[in-house]
Amino acid sequence: MHYVIVNADDFGNSEGINRGIIAAHEQGIVTSTSLMVNTPATAAAVKLARAYPNLGLGLHVNLTGEGERRVDLEDRQAVKRELEEQFNRFVDLTGQLPTHLDSHQHVHREFNVGHLFIKLSLRYGLPLRGYSEVVYNSRFYGQWEYGKTEERYISVEFLISLLKAAKRGITEIACHPGYVVAEFNPVYNWEREVELKALTNPRVKSVIEEEGIQLINYQDYLRRAEVA
């Protein structure tokens, strides 16, 4: 059996991103999202999450802003404090543990601080993106070299190719859907609407059925692990 988690990053980063993620869940194939707890639309995201209990909710640790370091990654103690604070804030806001851990701009993969994320994930028995049996696929993204937009990598055809290439076991495909809003203009912006169109395209759903892929979230994955 092929199991696929489709996780939308940046929940809480803006109202437009929040609405896009919910649309990708309701109308498309997104099964999971990662909440940022220190961004302008965090409270709105938490409220939305309560209305969609089947949408898995993880923690998207944000140690960076849009291109800015919020914490000096060379200061391990500062990173540890911020990591703990964001984890505790997630629990306070949602009343539950996150289903999984990942991070904005993949800072948890940086050598100097990665072990701090690993320790936190082990303490609570939570999957950490790229450090579990779940195969992580980051290729569905519309900017690569020097911030250049590559729309072909967020097309319906490319998404279908990623789904067809998913091996037996569990794969996570990361995505960043959203709606463009005037008050929020990040580096990665209009590409989010292109992603949203692909994630909600009927052809994509048809391929999932044809390939025998079962869409799950990290909570489903943890339940499977407990049974095994």
What is each model feature region?
Residues 21-27, 42-58, 90-94, 163-167:
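Acidic (Asp/Glu)-rich catalytic clusters
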Residues 87-164:
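Catalytic domains of cell-wall/extracellular-matrix polysaccharide-remodeling enzymes
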Residues 186-228:
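C-terminal domain-boundary segment and adjacent tail
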Residues 66-89:
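Glycine/small-residue-rich loop that forms an oxyanion/phosphate-binding "nest" at active or ligand-binding sites
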Residues 16-40:
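A short alpha/beta connector and helix-capping loop motif
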Residues 9-11, 36-38, 60-66, 104-106, ...:
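Active-site beta-loop-alpha junctions enriched in small/polar residues
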Residues 1-15:
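Boundary/entry segment of secreted carbohydrate-active catalytic domains
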Residues 3-5, 30-34, 54-60, 98-102, ...:
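Structural preference for beta-strand elements that scaffold enzyme active sites
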